């Protein structure tokens, strides 16, 4: 790899949408930007754009990003990925760039599931129906529902993740909060988020 391997110049979400419009697969915005799309405002600057799609649809990336170099990312190592090559289940990250000397332009994460049901990669017993997995902005950009995105964030729960949770708490439905509380309790029972989530579900008069 060259010296550009960790330099990023992410393409804009409009360009992403145009590229994926040419292929018939589900994709959605993930990461911190998904939280902002749910909130309806920019809560902070985002250095990159995280995208997600079902693992079964991964080959479509060669059509969406025709001519680009695609690499799998696992344990800090980047490996060139070519059409027809298998990506083993533990590997879920893909980086792309338009040329060997270019900065990285896109990151795509592969989601577990069968297309009808999304499953949490760290515990496949945690699931969500496909129709509840994403929401769509007025201009047609699909993004990950906040309870799933916050579940991903709960493992490390950095200060910025705590802020994301605080922003979302009073905008999420009771069903969303309950799903997240149960999922966080199952994956990391000691997380302080559990108490925050439970408190947010109490009736206001209590």
Whereabouts are the PLM-identified features?
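Compositionally biased terminal segments of proteins
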Residues: 1-206
